[in-house]
């Protein structure tokens, strides 16, 4: 192979190092799930290919900047990665730590690839590469922001544009997640400003528009961590300019600081009113307080996960094992998320996973980035657009937003790439050839080929498994057999996707198949979900999520299928052991006894014994979790069914003051109890919440009309009946007694 081919590889190598900057723009619908998956597969693939080409070029005698490795700052990423591997080997599950999950895209493999990119850029880049990469990042960030703004506009107008990713909740652009989007743009915004600094002509206008769109996109995500971080960075920039600036810029900055103080005072003075403004970013920021549900949930998670982390301060728990601690400390009365694998604080995440040394190295990485940016600052005249100042603000924004959210692979890759480039700009060394003599083509080609083979287990097979999972998902209701064929093919590939296959199997069965399918289709769906979750139950014995999901699938088995109660109890016992305050496993444990009671004749004495077994389970849970109304209303209903009105009232009276916000899980048993005892006033409250949650459920609306009438408010009942006459008039004929009564009331008003 001649020099010409080596030159071609060298040129391709330069493009490969820039290629990850384009990944945030990649969006594929209907092929893989979630959005981040295709980006991660491409990142892994690009990293492996770039590594293979580097080895080929290095062994072929191609010169690189090896002297840069003498810079002590350059070894921080390697040290952090080494600590991550060490703590994961001694952690809970190295296999899961290495691969992670589709839905997150993190893990040791991702960290390894990002670290490889850091060193490849460090050994290769020059100032021209820095400029090219910065322009690519600026253009891509501008396009991602454009998609986000268009999403927001179409959502406000109530439309849908075919080429835009669908919006579910807050806008997420091509990331499909508002926090991912805001975290990326919060860092990329300063790269856009850096490129804008020297841009001229049309490009200058383009980057000005990209800057504006990025700010709006971040605002529209309503991600408070990033918004607050940017506001703090803006204040720092204004203080700097008011101190170091000259002429009009200095004067403008001082006025800006005065305006910021005034706006801040007005904001805090009218915070309660601003919290009602129909604009989500302002609402979310104005609602920040210790009593805010999200804030109190975060603080609870930080405190309790931090306490668990202090039990293993040196070794940590290993990468991607935060979910185990989350499950352990989970309290449904305190935490919003059902399942989560992050603490919403990147610094705490590093401490939990990698121990104190991992946290210190992460802080050292941020500090080294800042130190390198400040060295760059000294190379340019002072001013707001000084590159060193911009990159200092970038890393400060990154650190501040990560205190409130979690890091993402794309933000981390960008920070690593820029860190390498800052080291490059601080001191440029002459190229040096690889210290070994130039190897034969066979050696360099063989080594590169071996590295490329890693693409098969790391990218090709997991990607194919993801595609098969997506294909099956698209068919899981309309053609269960075909869907199961795709799922089984995906599982036979033997990839790390098996855990996620189990999660998706549960979601498909519990959310759709169990309620929409019947007969053999439902049985087939159940058997698949049960089999994959059972396999994962054995393979991942520490996973409370798998145990809970398997228990729920067994609890909702088709009536034609016999369930092994002993196995279900074993499954639910494990779920309770690993997440003792999670309600679902306790309820399902009680359901085992209730199913046995329902299988007996009404006059069978054994029914009471099974009812009391269920009551014992729920009372044990109610004692552990004193703030939930659901188990108490369920106990009230069970005691009432046993004829013990005194105990029923005791539990209902305990439950009622705990019902502070609408909760459909609690409203159901509450309505049953209050209807049974004829307490119409209390029943109205819960039925009203159920109607507000699902206004199209006219059966519930009709129940509300009847109970409202019985509660002594026939006027309100009449208004509800008028709505039903317009929406579903036939429903009124189902209760002739009420129809006669409300008709008589209407006629009495004439």
Which stretches of residues belong to each language-model region?
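A membrane-periplasm/extracellular boundary helix in multi-pass inner-membrane enzymes
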Residues: 146, 152-155, 218-222, 226, ...
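TM-adjacent membrane-interface loops and short helices in multi-pass inner/ER membrane proteins
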Residues: 177, 290-292, 297-340, 347, ...
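Transmembrane signal-anchor hairpin modules in multi-pass inner-membrane enzymes, especially those
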Residues: 1-106, 114-116, 122-139, 195-209, ...
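Loop-to-helix entry and N-terminal half of a specific, functionally important transmembrane alpha helix
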Residues: 15-25, 141, 209-212, 345, ...
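Amphipathic alpha-helical repeat scaffolds of TPR domains
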Residues: 460-477, 491-519, 539-560, 579-601, ...
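Hydrophobic alpha-helical transmembrane segments
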Residues: 81-90, 129-161, 176, 215-221
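Hydrophobic, aromatic-rich transmembrane alpha-helices
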Residues: 7, 47-63, 188-198, 357-380
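Transmembrane alpha-helices of multi-pass inner-membrane enzymes
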Residues: 46-53, 191, 229-237, 362-365, ...
């Amino acid at each position: 192979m001649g020099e010409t081919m080596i030159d071609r590889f060298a040129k391709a190598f330069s493009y490969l190092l820039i290629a990850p900057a384009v990944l945030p723009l990649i969006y594929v619908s209907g092929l893989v799930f979630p959005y981040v998956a295709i980006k991660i597969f491409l990142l892994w693939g690009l990293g492996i290919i770039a590594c293979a080409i580097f080895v080929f070029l290095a062994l072929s005698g191609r010169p690189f900047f090896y002297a840069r490795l003498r810079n002590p700052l350059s070894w921080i990423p390697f040290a952090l990665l080494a600590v991550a591997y060490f703590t994961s080997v001694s952690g809970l599950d190295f296999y899961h730590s290495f691969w992670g999950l589709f839905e997150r895209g993190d893990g040791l493999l991702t960290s390894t690839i990002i670290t490889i990119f850091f060193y490849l850029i460090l050994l290769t880049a020059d100032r021209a590469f820095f400029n090219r990469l910065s322009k690519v990042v600026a253009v891509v960030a501008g396009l991602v922001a454009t998609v986000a703004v268009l999403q927001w506009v179409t959502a406000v107008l109530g439309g849908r544009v075919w080429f835009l990713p669908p919006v579910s909740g807050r806008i997420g652009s091509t990331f499909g997640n508002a926090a991912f989007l805001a975290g990326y743009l919060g860092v990329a915004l300063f790269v856009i400003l850096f490129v804008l600094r020297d841009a001229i002509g049309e490009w200058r206008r383009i980057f000005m528009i990209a800057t504006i769109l990025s700010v709006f996109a971040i605002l529209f995500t309503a991600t408070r961590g990033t918004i607050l971080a940017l506001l703090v960075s803006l204040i720092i920039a204004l203080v700097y300019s008011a101190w170091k600036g000259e002429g009009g810029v200095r004067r403008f900055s001082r006025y800006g600081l005065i305006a910021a103080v005034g706006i801040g005072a007005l904001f805090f003075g009218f915070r309660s009113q601003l919290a009602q403004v129909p604009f989500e970013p302002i609402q979310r920021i104005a609602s920040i307080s210790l009593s805010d549900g999200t804030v109190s949930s975060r603080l609870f998670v930080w405190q309790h996960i931090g306490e668990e982390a202090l039990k293993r301060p040196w070794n940590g728990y290993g990468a991607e094992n935060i979910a185990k601690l989350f499950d352990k400390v989970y309290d449904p009365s305190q935490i919003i998320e059902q399942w989560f694998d992050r603490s919403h604080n990147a610094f705490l995440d590093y401490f939990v996973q990698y121990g104190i040394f991992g946290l210190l190295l992460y802080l050292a990485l941020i500090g080294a980035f800042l130190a390198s940016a400040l060295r760059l600052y000294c190379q340019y005249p002072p001013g707001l657009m000084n590159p060193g100042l911009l990159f200092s603000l970038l890393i400060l924004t990154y650190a501040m937003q990560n205190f409130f959210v979690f890091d993402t692979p794309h933000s981390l890759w960008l920070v690593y790439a820029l860190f390498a480039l800052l080291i490059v700009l601080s001191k440029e060394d002459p190229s040096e050839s690889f210290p070994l003599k130039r190897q034969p083509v066979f050696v360099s080609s063989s080594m590169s080929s071996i590295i490329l083979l890693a693409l098969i287990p790391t990218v090709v097979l997991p990607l194919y498994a993801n595609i098969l999972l997506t294909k099956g998902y698209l068919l899981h209701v309309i053609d269960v057999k075909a869907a199961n064929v795709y799922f089984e093919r995906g599982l036979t590939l033997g990839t790390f996707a098996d855990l996620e296959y189990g999660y998706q199997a549960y979601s498909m069965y519990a959310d759709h198949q169990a309620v929409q399918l019947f007969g053999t289709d439902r049985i087939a769906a159940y058997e698949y979900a049960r089999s994959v979750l059972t396999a994962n139950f054995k393979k991942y014995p520490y996973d409370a999520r798998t145990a809970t999901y398997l228990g729920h699938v067994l609890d909702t088995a088709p009536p034609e299928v016999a369930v092994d109660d002993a196995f279900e109890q074993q499954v639910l016992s494990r779920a309770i052991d690993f997440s003792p305050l999670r309600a679902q496993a306790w309820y399902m444990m009680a359901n085992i006894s209730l199913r046995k009671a329902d299988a007996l004749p009404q006059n069978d004495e054994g029914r009471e014994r099974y009812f009391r077994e269920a009551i014992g389970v729920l009372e044990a849970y109610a004692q552990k979790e004193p703030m939930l109304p659901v188990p108490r209303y369920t106990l009230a209903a069970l005691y009432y069914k046993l004829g013990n009105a005194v105990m029923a009232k005791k539990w209902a009276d305990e439950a009622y003051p705990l019902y502070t916000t609408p909760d459909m899980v609690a409203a159901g048993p509450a309505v049953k109890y209050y209807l049974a005892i004829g307490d119409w006033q209390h029943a109205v409250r819960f039925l009203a919440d159920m109607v507000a949650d699902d206004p199209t459920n006219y059966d519930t609306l009709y129940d509300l009309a009847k109970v409202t009438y019985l509660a002594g408010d026939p006027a309100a009942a009449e208004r509800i009946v008028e709505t039903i006459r317009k929406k579903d008039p036939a429903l009124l004929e189902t209760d002739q007694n009420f129809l006669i009564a409300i008709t008589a009331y209407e006629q009495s008003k004439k």
